[in-house]
């Protein structure tokens, strides 16, 4: 799999980026050690592995907005990641991007059986949806 060349200028600013991220979210919600980031070097599609620039695990919508706004202003890429179970490669980390881990946002907000529609936060897994609807004869 051919991935884009990382922006070395962003990588060189990594320490300062992580310091600022720790001002936007609780300090323990920023992961920047190589060892700790190994858990985030792939999604369910593990054929491609890459450590991200940093991992941010926000706890509130306001924290997400603050991180997104600041990264946009600084020209820093963000890779959003739900539960990390995707097999499509849609949440593959990049060396010059902040991985925004949204696994804490794991609530099913609405199930509309008539319209066959579920509204869920990004950390909800397919299995969680299946378990929520299976008693009513549905499967996802």
Protein language model annotation of sequence segments:
Residues 21, 46-78, 96, 102-140:
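N-terminal glycine-rich flavin-associated loop
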Residues 38-40, 100-103:
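Short hydrophobic/aromatic-rich motifs at helix boundaries and adjacent loops
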Residues 1-44, 73-76:
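N-terminal accessory segments
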Residues 33, 81, 101-103:
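Generic beta-strand/beta-sheet core signal
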């Amino acid at each position: 799999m051919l991935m884009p060349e990382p922006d070395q200028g962003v990588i060189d600013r990594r320490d300062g980026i992580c310091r600022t991220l720790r001002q936007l979210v609780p300090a323990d919600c920023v992961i920047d050690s190589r060892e700790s980031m190994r858990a985030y070097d792939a999604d369910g599609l593990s054929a491609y592995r890459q450590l991200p620039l940093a991992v941010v695990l926000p706890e509130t919508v306001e924290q997400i907005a603050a991180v997104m706004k600041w990264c946009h202003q600084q020209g820093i890429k963000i890779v959003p990641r739900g539960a990390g179970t995707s097999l499509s490669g849609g949440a593959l980390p990049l060396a010059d991007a902040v991985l925004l881990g949204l696994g804490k946002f794991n609530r099913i907000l609405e199930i509309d059986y008539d319209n066959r529609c579920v509204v869920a936060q990004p950390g909800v897994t397919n299995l969680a949806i299946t378990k929520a609807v299976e008693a009513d004869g549905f499967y996802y």
